[in-house]
């Protein structure tokens, strides 16, 4: 029998405490920086974030564990053999163009019932909410003795996921689990993620620099070229800044999540659209041709390179996330979100064919691949969580597929479940979590943790 839905009336005091804990965690600039020789494998800030949340978890009365090598940590309620896992991450993407934030990205503020700050939505806020959901289960004695609940904190989700992979080697996969790092209602399929660099011959005297990570839409580009100040007339007011001393032009775009490139304003593409008009003599250049053939029409499916890459999980999408200038070359970094039914070998083959036709001096440098993830819509885990979500909102929604990548792809019997309907806010300037969504999320996670204990009883 399905358990009755719990409508939790959180006190104003506890809600304020929860928001404060989110804000304190978001103050820590935990951008993951992997090092094999560092005392802190993902940087001291990631370690500080882990220490903060483990201390909080311990104050709630949970069992806490920190990996001796500082790779990950977790907090646990109960001692049952069957573990309900909650997979959260404490690392964040860089803030991007600081001038586009209403406040410092790592000095969280509250405005109009919204918590602004890097990590508020992805994924520190959801981590704190789930800790409070566990606290409710503990305080109300709602955990069956055969179960335990373990929230696992990763420190490199935005980069190589090595932190959570290390946890898997040490402890294995939980009995069932979810990650609060996606989009409501529930994600049953995640596209393959393919990161690749393309090396192009340099255009004489043109120096370019943009982007810090490929899974983030670049919100600015810095360009140096003779008389480039004259290019400002091709942009709207407020879209450029020129440094006369250095002779560098900054073009301003708008950041966002690399899985939804259409929801930002890519500064790299913006620059090249104008540059081909400013310097038409370079239109035959391989880099200019690549950009104009694939990006200037505001489409991101790279159909010229990857024709008919589409299935039930959607179309292929591409984020041109980085560009660097080195002697003789530009290095362009791409984040491809590839439909579930396509493979890494297909991508490399089709990209190689296209590049060979365009210019044989272009080099392909594959960086990393994250495999696709799919779980059946009729799976017991999916059914319990979807029923819980739909009951909360009085809706009848179906699970969805996304281009975003979460820890769910590493684990068996795991899905991405929440915590927002506005995933495009992740990775952008002025990332925020609304109070209404925070309250709804807490309710949903409390009921999810309560009902998942009936997993073995579901048919």
Which residue ranges define each predicted feature?
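Active-site metal-coordination/substrate-binding segment of hydrolases
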Residues: 83-153, 159, 171, 435-440
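Midchain, well-structured core segments that form catalytic/ion-binding scaffolds
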Residues: 158, 165-340
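Substrate-recognition/cap regions that form aromatic- and gly/pro-loop-enriched pockets
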Residues: 325, 330-400, 404
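Generic non-transmembrane alpha-helical segments
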Residues: 14-17, 21-28, 52-60, 136, ...
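N-terminal helical capping/dimerization or prosegment-like subdomains
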Residues: 1-85, 92-96, 331-333, 348, ...
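Short beta-strand
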Residues: 64-68, 240-244, 320, 399-400
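Zn-dependent metallopeptidase/amidohydrolase metal-coordination segment
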Residues: 10, 29, 247-250, 326, ...
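Phosphate-handling active-site elements
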Residues: 111-113, 133-150, 278-286, 394-396, ...
């Amino acid at each position: 029998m399905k358990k009755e839905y719990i409508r939790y009336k959180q006190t104003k005091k506890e809600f304020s405490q929860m928001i404060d804990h989110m804000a304190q965690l978001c103050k820590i600039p935990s951008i993951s920086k992997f090092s094999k020789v560092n005392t802190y494998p993902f940087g001291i800030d990631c370690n500080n974030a882990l220490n903060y949340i483990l201390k909080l978890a311990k104050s709630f009365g949970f069992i806490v564990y920190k990996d001796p090598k500082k790779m990950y940590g977790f907090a646990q309620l109960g001692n049952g053999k069957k573990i309900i896992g909650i997979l959260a991450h404490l690392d964040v993407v860089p803030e991007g163009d600081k001038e586009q934030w209403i406040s410092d990205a790592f000095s969280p503020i509250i405005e109009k019932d919204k918590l602004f700050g890097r990590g508020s939505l992805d994924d520190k806020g959801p981590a704190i909410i789930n800790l409070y959901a566990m606290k409710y289960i503990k305080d109300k004695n709602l955990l069956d003795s055969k179960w335990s609940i373990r929230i696992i904190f990763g420190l490199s989700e935005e980069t190589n996921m090595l932190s959570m992979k290390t946890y898997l080697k040490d402890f294995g996969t939980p009995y069932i689990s979810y990650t609060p790092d996606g989009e409501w209602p529930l994600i049953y399929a995640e596209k393959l993620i393919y990161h690749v660099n393309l090396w192009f011959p340099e255009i004489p005297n043109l120096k370019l620099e943009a982007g810090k990570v490929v899974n983030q839409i670049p919100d600015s580009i810095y360009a140096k070229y003779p008389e480039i100040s004259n290019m400002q007339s091709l942009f709207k007011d407020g879209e450029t800044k020129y440094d006369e001393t250095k002779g560098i032009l900054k073009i301003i775009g708008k950041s966002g999540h690399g899985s939804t490139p259409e929801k930002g304003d890519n500064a790299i593409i913006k620059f090249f659209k104008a540059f081909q008009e400013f310097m038409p003599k370079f239109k035959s250049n391989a880099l200019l041709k690549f950009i104009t053939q694939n990006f200037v029409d505001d489409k991101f499916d790279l159909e010229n390179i990857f024709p008919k890459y589409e299935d039930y999980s959607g179309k292929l999408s591409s984020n041109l996330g980085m560009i660097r200038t080195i002697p003789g070359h530009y290095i362009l970094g791409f984040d491809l979100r590839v439909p579930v039914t396509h493979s890494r070998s297909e991508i490399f083959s089709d990209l190689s064919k296209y590049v060979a036709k365009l210019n044989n001096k272009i080099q392909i440098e594959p960086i990393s691949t994250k495999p696709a993830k799919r779980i059946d819509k009729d799976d017991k885990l999916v059914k319990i969580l979807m029923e819980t979500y739909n009951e909360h909102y009085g809706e009848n929604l179906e699970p969805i597929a996304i281009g975003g990548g979460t820890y769910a792809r590493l684990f068996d019997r795991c899905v991405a479940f929440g915590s927002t309907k506005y995933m495009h806010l992740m990775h952008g300037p002025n990332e925020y979590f609304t109070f209404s969504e925070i309250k709804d999320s807490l309710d949903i996670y409390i009921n999810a943790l309560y009902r998942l204990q009936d997993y073995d009883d579901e048919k």
